Amino acid sequence: MKAIVCPEFGPPDVLYVEERETPTPDDGELLIEPEAWGVNYVDALMVAGGYQLKPELPFVPGLEAAGRVVENRSDNPAFAPGTAVMIGMRPGTFAEQVVVPKKAVMPVPTGMSM
């Protein structure tokens, strides 16, 4: 699985793509395969080191995405594999697969594309 990694705070060219192991969800979590990502000002500030909360380095940036459930280890049966969802979370969405707690997941409304 590929992920964008920020090894140090700085301009966008400090970012690089890294091959990583596919994450495994624990109880209460879901494995999501993003299909669309939001890139916003907070992401840029985090990479630059200018946001009020600084993630531990190195980190995978990205706070929001939309994609499909791959595995559901939560107690919510609404998130069956293949379900289209939106996620908002701590940094980490700029990856091919992301593990998130169920509280960070909401279904994509019917009729809305990703």
Where are the predicted features?
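Extreme N-terminal starter segment of soluble prokaryotic enzymes
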Residues: 1-2
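Short beta-strand-to-turn element immediately C-terminal to the catalytic PLP-Schiff-base lysine
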Residues: 6, 47, 70-73, 99-101
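Extracellular beta-rich ligand/substrate-recognition surface
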Residues: 7-14
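Short loop/helix-cap segments at secondary-structure boundaries that form the rim of catalytic
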Residues: 14, 79, 98-100
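Conserved hydrophobic/aromatic beta-strand scaffold that supports enzyme active sites
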Residues: 17-22, 66-68, 97-99, 105
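Glycine-rich beta-strand-centered segment in the early N-terminal region that forms part
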Residues: 21-38, 50-92
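Cytochrome P450 core scaffold surrounding the K-helix E-X-X-R motif
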Residues: 42-48
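NAD(P)H dinucleotide-binding glycine-rich loop of Rossmann-like/cofactor-binding domains
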Residues: 45, 84-114
